[in-house]
Every structure is written in C-alpha cells, then in structure tokens.
Amino acid sequence: MKKANIEFSRSFFYLVTLILILAVPGCGVKFIADYDEATDKSVTELQRKVEGFLVDIERKVGTDDAAYSNNTEFYDEVRVDISAIRVRAAAREKNEITLEQLDLVQKNLDNLEKLHELGFNSPEEIEPLRKAFNASFTAILKFELAKKRGEKI
C-alpha cells in the first residue's frame, strides 16, 4: 500500500510539473501597461502646442508680446493638459514609466516658465528648451509606440 501511495505521489508530482511547464509559457506576464491611443494623441497635441509657442516666442523676442506677463495663459493651459494626460496615465496599471516621463515634461515646463519670467534676450536661448521638450515628448511617444507593437521592454 505504501508503495502504491509513493507511486501515485510521484505520478501526481510529475503530472503537475508537466502542466506547469506547459502552462507558464502561455501566461504572458506584463510588466508595463498596454498601448494607449489617447495618451499617444494627447502627447502629440501637447508637443504641437509647445512647439507652436516656442516658435512664436522666438519670433517675438525683444517685444512686449514675448513678455512673460503676456503669455501666462499658455502655461496655465499646458499645466491643465499635462495634468489630464497624467491622470489618464495614472489610472492605468503598470504605467509608472509613462508617469515619470510626464513628470519630466512638467519639469521642462517649470524651467521654461522660470526662464521666461527672467526674459529671453535672443531666439537662440529657445533652442536648448526645445531640445529638452522634444526629447521628453519623443521618449513618451517611442514608449507608447513600442507598447503598440508589443515589443519586450
């Protein structure tokens, strides 16, 4: 009887092991959120808005139209846009990387605003800010597109 129990236990163990070996590869463990078309589109729209603002300021440097006090509405609008994108991203599980990237966009906006308050003296001062924003936007969009393709990240 003991021998039969031992044989049954071994057979059961091997059967369970075989089932697990076959089942585990079929279980796709996800470490990041899925692609989100709304985030993709919102970030693209935000990039266009920021780029449009930078182009406008470049043209107006040295005029009253370029003064910070005449452009505070832009900063308010972009803060609302970033907040809306961030809330959506936070509502999705395993989306921490996108949230970190959005935090960098927010820091870039904070830096732009501080520099704008000090005043721009030449259009060349805008280019490093543009590069920082575009690097952040590109990172977010590349990450979303990689999710869309289902790449291992």
Predicted regions and their residues:
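C-terminal amphipathic alpha-helix
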Residues: 108-153
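Structured, soluble extracytoplasmic/luminal domains of envelope-associated proteins
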Residues: 87-116
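C-terminal motif of bacterial Sec signal peptides marking the signal peptidase cleavage site
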Residues: 22-26
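Alpha-helical segments in soluble extracytoplasmic regions
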Residues: 53-94
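Bacterial signal peptide processing site
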Residues: 28-31
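Post-signal peptide N-terminal segment of mature Sec-exported envelope proteins
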Residues: 34-58
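Bacterial N-terminal signal peptides that target proteins for export
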Residues: 2-16
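Short, charged, amphipathic alpha-helical segments
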Residues: 65-76, 98-103, 124-131
